[in-house]
Amino acid sequence: MRTRNMPALGLWFWVLLVCSSLATAQGKLNLLSGALTPEKLKQIILSLQDWHPFPKVSEHEEWQKLPEKVRAACVRRAEKNLNCEWETPKASIFLDFVRNGNRSRYEAVSFSRRAKLAELVIGECIEGKGRFLDDILNGIWTICEETYWGVPAHVSAQKKGSGLPDAAEPTVDLFAAETGMLLAWTDYLLGEQLDGVSPLVRERILYEVQRRILSVNLARDDFWWMGLNGQKVNNWNPWICSNWLIAVLLLEKEPDRRIQSISKILKCLDQFLNSYPKDGGCDEGPGYWDRAGASLYDSLELLHGASNGRINIFENPLVREIGRYIGRLHISGRYYINFADAAAKLNANASVIYRFGKSIRDQDMMGFGAFLAKQQNLGEDSIRGSFGWLGRVLPMLFVLDELTKATPKEPLGRDFWLPELQIMGARSLEGSEKGLYLAAKGGHNAESHNHNDVGNLIVYADGYPVLIDVGVESYTAKTFSNRRYEIWTMQSAYHNLPTINGFMQKDGREFQATDVKYKSGPKAVSFSLDIAKAYPEGAQVQSWKRTVTLERGKQVILEDRYILKGAKQPVQMTLMSGRKPELTGEGKIRLASPEGILDAKPVFIHFDQGQWSAALETIPLVDGQLRSSWRERLYRILLTAKQIPLRGEYSILIKQ
């Protein structure tokens, strides 16, 4: 980001920030608000007039420096919206969420409006002829006319609860903040042109963003995502804060309110950082890292730019570990370890990962960003992501040339261990997707976007899934309600886990792993834990010691040793796979090559047929989110114990 020069205050303040960060790394961090008082912010934050992060439409030469193919692609996207209809998000569709649990119909209309506006704005910035201005005006006006900028699933934050939005009480959710950001960037980029249409356009933008976002967030401390009253925070915190910060920096004209707002944003971000595991692990999974750790980076990058580099905590160990998490969770290609509400396949944000790596001076992370850019064909004729996210699109466009010239490097580390999150991953051969890959988790059953999955494992072979974590279906009203664990994808019986005496694992913080151990060496890596406490009393489990081992270049071994207080039903072990299983006899199950993958070899599961009887289930998939990872169907392998002992042990082997 570019800034106009500001008188230097000296190196001392940057050193103070870094030293404060390092000194408090083991306690309550307050990395930002601890050192950055409102008085200090007044000295270092650039004024509204001086902060110039990206070229405006009038700086035509700067926009023409973008790759020609990308410029052409952006203009084509804008042209599709010429004279477009701005579909109205109807009140009856808003009520879908409370009537039938559907959140998708309203979101489709709302998100489409914002994507259209962003596409038109970028097209106008590149072309600069005024051809898209009337459609931009229509987009601004229709969005400003909406009663609520958020989505039906989040309107319950208002005092009158779920249902229709209360126009008298604006509340701030993820997408209200996104909308404020979109309009703020539109005002910044096209301000003079909009004034040429009518000064009332920018006045309307300021009025709506002020009353819906800026004034509300400054006045209220009770939004749970702020964490200011001790609430547990998640990705909502940095996601909203990053967009709120953009709106403050670009639209808040009153200097004291501008500083007050930034100071409050720092306090909110500190609640996120204070609660983050020191190992950098995101318990929401790699998909949500894009709006957890990566949105934290968005915020830190904005603060760095808006202070001429004087706000800089990129050397802090926690910040560095938060960045490195996403590369550690990468398995191969588009596949990632997907515990919790994460999809197995991701198109991770190449630009954010590259820039995060550059800021923390991590060459491997920068190489990963370059790898993703090549994987996604960035710089040829595409740019990644929804155009509704101008806060992500703009920095991506202006780092694109550097990003596409960087040396790509896929992160294929030998193994990793996140001790606080209790997640491990290991591969047969460092630097290669060939051979078997193992990931497993401990943790507890009250994690953010939790599944009841303590002790679950994932196995890949030559970069393709073998034993899987199914992930999550498209969100509905049930997903974040007290009926969440009625959904099959959340249940331990549909993870690679045992059902004991007819009982699945239970949700709650007390249902957790104990005695967790991890050991890695050149020939093997092992992970062990006791999962007994993840089950309710009815399961009558005294101990259930699970050990998973990757013998590099050879096999994965799953070993369970257990003691029960009572045995009423046989143990039933679930193994989930996207590969079609075949019982071949002699305690062997053949897992076929994945559908459509010609170069993948079959994999075999070996079990003691004296201990187990095996059955196979096919699970047809109708949900679009699941189909995007697993195509038309999944398979559930059920191994049922032939005896009901109080003590027992067994081993299951996975081999190529």
Question: What is each of the regions a protein language model found here?
Answer:
Residues T24-Q26, V155-S156, A177, L372-G388, ...:
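CBM-like, beta-strand-rich accessory domains located in the C-terminal region of large
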Residues V18-S20:
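N-terminal signal peptide c-region/cleavage motif recognized by signal peptidases
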Residues A78-P89, I136-H154, L200-W225, Q260-G280, ...:
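Long, well-ordered core segments of solenoidal/helical folds
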Residues E124-L137, T186-Q210, V248-L266, L303-V319, ...:
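Structural helix-adjacent loops and short alpha-helical linkers that scaffold large soluble proteins
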